[in-house]
Protein backbone atom coordinates (compact mmCIF):
# COMPACT_ATOMS: atom_id res chain seq x y z
CA UNK A 1 0.00 0.00 0.00
CA UNK A 2 1.45 3.33 -1.00
CA UNK A 3 1.76 6.21 1.44
CA UNK A 4 -0.15 9.44 0.82
CA UNK A 5 2.11 12.04 -0.78
CA UNK A 6 0.35 14.93 0.92
CA UNK A 7 -1.81 15.34 3.98
CA UNK A 8 -2.51 19.08 4.21
CA UNK A 9 -4.34 21.11 1.59
CA UNK A 10 -6.38 24.32 1.38
CA UNK A 11 -9.02 24.07 -1.32
CA UNK A 12 -9.61 27.09 -3.60
CA UNK A 13 -13.04 27.76 -2.15
CA UNK A 14 -13.64 31.48 -2.65
CA UNK A 15 -16.75 31.17 -4.81
CA UNK A 16 -17.84 27.87 -3.30
CA UNK A 17 -17.65 29.35 0.20
CA UNK A 18 -19.67 32.40 -0.84
CA UNK A 19 -22.37 30.24 -2.44
CA UNK A 20 -22.50 27.99 0.63
CA UNK A 21 -22.31 30.88 3.10
CA UNK A 22 -19.32 29.29 4.80
CA UNK A 23 -15.54 29.59 5.15
CA UNK A 24 -13.53 30.49 2.09
CA UNK A 25 -10.31 28.82 3.19
CA UNK A 26 -7.58 31.41 3.70
CA UNK A 27 -9.36 34.03 1.61
CA UNK A 28 -10.42 37.17 3.45
CA UNK A 29 -14.09 38.02 3.14
CA UNK A 30 -14.69 39.79 -0.19
CA UNK A 31 -16.67 42.64 1.38
CA UNK A 32 -18.86 43.09 4.45
CA UNK A 33 -21.80 43.61 2.08
CA UNK A 34 -22.09 43.07 -1.64
CA UNK A 35 -24.49 42.71 -4.54
CA UNK A 36 -24.41 39.16 -5.96
CA UNK A 37 -25.29 38.90 -9.65
CA UNK A 38 -26.39 35.61 -11.21
CA UNK A 39 -28.15 34.23 -14.26
CA UNK A 40 -31.64 32.79 -13.78
CA UNK A 41 -34.01 31.86 -16.62
CA UNK A 42 -31.86 33.71 -19.18
CA UNK A 43 -32.09 36.96 -17.20
CA UNK A 44 -29.63 38.60 -14.84
CA UNK A 45 -30.78 38.76 -11.24
CA UNK A 46 -29.10 40.15 -8.16
CA UNK A 47 -29.46 40.10 -4.41
CA UNK A 48 -27.97 42.21 -1.66
CA UNK A 49 -25.91 40.08 0.71
CA UNK A 50 -24.19 40.58 4.05
CA UNK A 51 -21.24 38.22 4.45
CA UNK A 52 -22.16 35.63 7.09
CA UNK A 53 -18.82 35.88 8.93
CA UNK A 54 -19.08 39.67 8.98
CA UNK A 55 -22.66 39.52 10.26
CA UNK A 56 -21.57 37.19 13.05
CA UNK A 57 -18.79 39.61 14.08
CA UNK A 58 -21.29 42.47 14.09
CA UNK A 59 -23.92 40.60 16.13
CA UNK A 60 -21.77 38.62 18.57
CA UNK A 61 -18.88 40.99 19.14
CA UNK A 62 -20.48 44.37 18.43
CA UNK A 63 -17.84 45.16 15.79
CA UNK A 64 -18.77 48.07 13.53
CA UNK A 65 -19.09 47.09 9.83
CA UNK A 66 -16.50 49.67 8.74
CA UNK A 67 -13.92 48.11 11.12
CA UNK A 68 -14.07 44.65 9.48
CA UNK A 69 -11.17 44.16 7.09
CA UNK A 70 -12.04 42.70 3.69
CA UNK A 71 -10.27 41.68 0.50
CA UNK A 72 -10.99 45.15 -0.84
CA UNK A 73 -9.21 46.75 2.12
CA UNK A 74 -6.27 44.41 1.59
CA UNK A 75 -6.19 45.35 -2.12
CA UNK A 76 -4.26 48.43 -1.13
CA UNK A 77 -1.75 46.32 0.83
CA UNK A 78 -1.07 43.44 -1.57
CA UNK A 79 2.33 42.73 0.03
CA UNK A 80 0.65 41.87 3.32
CA UNK A 81 -1.67 39.50 1.45
CA UNK A 82 1.17 37.81 -0.48
CA UNK A 83 3.25 37.48 2.68
CA UNK A 84 0.34 35.85 4.52
CA UNK A 85 -0.20 33.31 1.75
CA UNK A 86 3.53 32.54 1.55
CA UNK A 87 3.69 31.98 5.32
CA UNK A 88 0.68 29.64 5.31
CA UNK A 89 2.05 27.80 2.25
CA UNK A 90 5.05 26.64 4.31
CA UNK A 91 2.70 24.40 6.31
CA UNK A 92 0.52 23.13 3.45
CA UNK A 93 1.69 20.25 1.24
CA UNK A 94 -0.42 21.10 -1.79
CA UNK A 95 -0.63 24.43 -3.58
CA UNK A 96 -2.77 27.20 -2.13
CA UNK A 97 -4.60 29.05 -4.86
CA UNK A 98 -5.72 32.45 -3.70
CA UNK A 99 -7.10 35.59 -5.32
CA UNK A 100 -5.14 38.76 -4.73
CA UNK A 101 -7.66 41.57 -5.17
CA UNK A 102 -6.17 44.81 -6.48
CA UNK A 103 -7.60 48.31 -6.80
CA UNK A 104 -9.16 49.10 -10.19
CA UNK A 105 -6.69 49.80 -13.00
CA UNK A 106 -5.75 53.37 -13.83
CA UNK A 107 -6.59 54.61 -10.34
CA UNK A 108 -4.35 56.36 -7.84
CA UNK A 109 -3.52 52.98 -6.23
CA UNK A 110 -3.10 50.92 -9.43
CA UNK A 111 -1.51 52.54 -12.48
CA UNK A 112 1.57 52.47 -14.72
CA UNK A 113 3.72 53.90 -11.93
CA UNK A 114 2.81 51.04 -9.59
CA UNK A 115 3.48 48.16 -11.99
CA UNK A 116 7.20 48.02 -11.23
CA UNK A 117 6.60 48.05 -7.47
CA UNK A 118 4.00 45.26 -7.76
CA UNK A 119 6.39 43.23 -9.96
CA UNK A 120 9.19 43.58 -7.42
CA UNK A 121 6.90 42.64 -4.54
CA UNK A 122 5.60 39.60 -6.42
CA UNK A 123 9.16 38.51 -7.24
CA UNK A 124 10.03 38.76 -3.54
CA UNK A 125 7.38 36.13 -2.65
CA UNK A 126 7.05 34.09 -5.88
CA UNK A 127 9.49 31.36 -4.81
CA UNK A 128 7.29 30.68 -1.74
CA UNK A 129 3.95 30.65 -3.61
CA UNK A 130 2.44 27.85 -5.66
CA UNK A 131 -0.68 29.50 -7.03
CA UNK A 132 -2.53 32.80 -7.05
CA UNK A 133 -4.70 34.99 -9.24
CA UNK A 134 -4.57 38.78 -9.47
CA UNK A 135 -7.96 40.43 -9.97
CA UNK A 136 -8.10 44.24 -10.33
CA UNK A 137 -11.50 45.57 -9.26
CA UNK A 138 -13.74 46.29 -12.25
CA UNK A 139 -11.50 44.45 -14.74
CA UNK A 140 -14.39 42.30 -15.91
CA UNK A 141 -17.74 43.55 -17.10
CA UNK A 142 -20.62 42.10 -15.14
CA UNK A 143 -18.62 41.06 -12.09
CA UNK A 144 -20.53 38.49 -10.03
CA UNK A 145 -19.89 40.43 -6.78
CA UNK A 146 -19.97 44.20 -6.33
CA UNK A 147 -19.28 45.80 -2.94
CA UNK A 148 -22.07 47.92 -1.44
CA UNK A 149 -22.59 49.60 1.91
CA UNK A 150 -23.73 47.54 4.88
CA UNK A 151 -26.71 49.86 5.32
CA UNK A 152 -27.85 49.34 1.71
CA UNK A 153 -27.55 45.56 2.05
CA UNK A 154 -29.55 45.49 5.30
CA UNK A 155 -32.26 47.67 3.75
CA UNK A 156 -32.71 45.33 0.76
CA UNK A 157 -31.73 42.01 2.36
CA UNK A 158 -33.78 39.05 1.14
CA UNK A 159 -35.11 40.82 -1.96
CA UNK A 160 -34.34 39.50 -5.43
CA UNK A 161 -34.00 42.02 -8.24
CA UNK A 162 -34.08 41.41 -11.97
CA UNK A 163 -32.02 43.40 -14.45
CA UNK A 164 -33.82 44.68 -17.52
CA UNK A 165 -31.27 43.03 -19.78
CA UNK A 166 -32.24 39.67 -21.23
CA UNK A 167 -29.30 37.47 -22.13
CA UNK A 168 -28.90 35.05 -24.97
CA UNK A 169 -26.64 32.02 -24.95
CA UNK A 170 -23.89 33.51 -22.80
CA UNK A 171 -21.12 31.93 -24.85
CA UNK A 172 -22.64 32.12 -28.32
CA UNK A 173 -19.85 33.83 -30.22
CA UNK A 174 -21.48 33.28 -33.60
CA UNK A 175 -23.42 36.54 -33.31
CA UNK A 176 -22.31 39.81 -34.82
CA UNK A 177 -20.32 40.94 -31.77
CA UNK A 178 -18.09 37.86 -31.59
CA UNK A 179 -17.90 38.26 -27.82
CA UNK A 180 -18.33 35.45 -25.33
CA UNK A 181 -19.85 36.65 -22.10
CA UNK A 182 -21.51 39.82 -21.01
What would you call each of these model-derived segments?
Residues 3, 8-174, 178-182:
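Catalytic alpha/beta core of large soluble enzyme barrels
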Amino acid sequence: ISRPVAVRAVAPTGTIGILGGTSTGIEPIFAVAYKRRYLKNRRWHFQHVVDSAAQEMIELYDIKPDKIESALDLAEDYERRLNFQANVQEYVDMAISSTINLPGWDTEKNNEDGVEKFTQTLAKYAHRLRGFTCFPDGCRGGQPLTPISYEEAIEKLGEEFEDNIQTHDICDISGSSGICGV
